[in-house]
Regions:
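Short N-terminal helix/helix-N-cap motif within the alpha/beta-hydrolase-1
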Residues: 167-171, 198
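A short glycine-rich, Lys/Arg-flanked "PGG" loop and its adjoining helix->strand segment in the class I
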Residues: 170-185
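A short His-aromatic
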Residues: 161-165
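Short glycine/proline- and charge-enriched loop/turn segments
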Residues: 66-68, 197-206, 245-251
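Conserved N-terminal segment of class I S-adenosyl-L-methionine
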Residues: 1-160, 170-173, 232-236, 242, ...
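Short, glycine-/aromatic-enriched active-site segment of Class I SAM-dependent methyltransferases
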Residues: 187-220, 236
Length: 275
């Protein structure tokens, strides 16, 4: 059966016949959400094919871990994480943290170094084994994101550039609410696909199943029952802004990322609480 919008159940218009996953891209004008594929079964088959191939070999964390996260990729992620943490820390009231999609393990280690009691999930068993050797107290479990199940509750749930990869993001966001403490926060960052260059990158260069705009993401989380604490669009700082920041320390509160508008920012961030 042809897919409809996961938010309003409305009909979709074809946006593009091509994508990184060789799936067509469809668009809901009502929700401003871009969706990969024409049927759920088609999407499941493409994702299964992707992860059975060389995907995990190409995303191995060994280089990053062996460099103690001094490699170029990790340093770029460090700059983004610093900004994310500055954006969220005023809302954090406890120290238990669950990271959804640990990747190479940079963020979960940096949170542990900040004194958090960290847990994480990651589908690549090789990465999990290496990351667990780096963490002093924290633990990463090998499981798919959508297959995750736990009775534990956390002060912070952290999900950076993972939601766009899920087959059923609404179902996942409903389920993970049970793992968030009453006064806890849920941080999500995704590509800002209202910014045209990022939309094209999300479609053409990455195996993303959903391509979110601010309207689509906020509608999704509110309909599930989350309360939006903060939502913003961010871009990397320019060199001149970096110089200004060195002189005037309080110029950019989330440096080295700068808050901007939906048509010029790379990343879309949202902080949620259970309503």
């Amino acid at each position: 059966m042809k897919m409809t919008c996961i938010l309003c159940n409305g009909m979709l218009d074809e946006y593009s016949k091509e994508s990184n996953l060789d799936l067509s891209i469809n668009h809901c004008k009502n929700c401003n959400l871009y969706i990969s594929g024409n049927t759920k079964q088609e999407v499941i088959e493409k994702v299964s094919e992707l992860y059975k191939g060389d995907y995990w070999n190409e995303h191995n964390s060994e280089t990053s871990i062996n460099s103690e996260y001094t490699d170029v990729d990790s340093q770029g992620k460090r700059r983004n994480w610093v900004s994310q943490f500055l954006y969220t820390k005023q809302y954090i009231t406890g120290k238990t943290l669950l990271e959804i999609g640990v990747g190479a393990g940079q963020s979960i280690l940096w949170f542990e170094e900040e004194g958090f009691d960290v847990s994480g999930i990651e589908p690549d068993g090789r990465n999990v084994s290496m990351i667990n050797k780096v963490l002093k107290r924290g633990k990463v479990a090998e499981t798919s994101v959508e297959g995750f199940s736990s009775d534990k509750v956390f002060d912070v749930i952290w999900m950076s550039h993972v939601l766009e990869h899920l087959i059923e993001p609404v179902r996942f966001l409903k389920k993970i609410r049970n793992n968030l403490k009453k006064n806890g926060i849920f941080f999500i960052e995704v590509p800002n696909c209202e910014y045209e260059p990022m939309l094209q990158s999300s479609i053409e260069k990455n195996p993303h199943l959903y391509h979110f705009t601010k309207k689509a993401l906020t509608k999704m989380v509110e309909e599930i029952g989350y309360k939006i604490v903060s939502c913003g669009i961010f871009r990397p700082a320019t060199k001149s802004e970096g110089m200004r920041h060195k002189i005037l320390k309080n110029s950019f509160p989330y440096y080295p990322r700068i808050m901007t508008d939906v048509h010029s920012g790379r990343d879309l961030r949202i902080i949620l609480k259970n309503s």
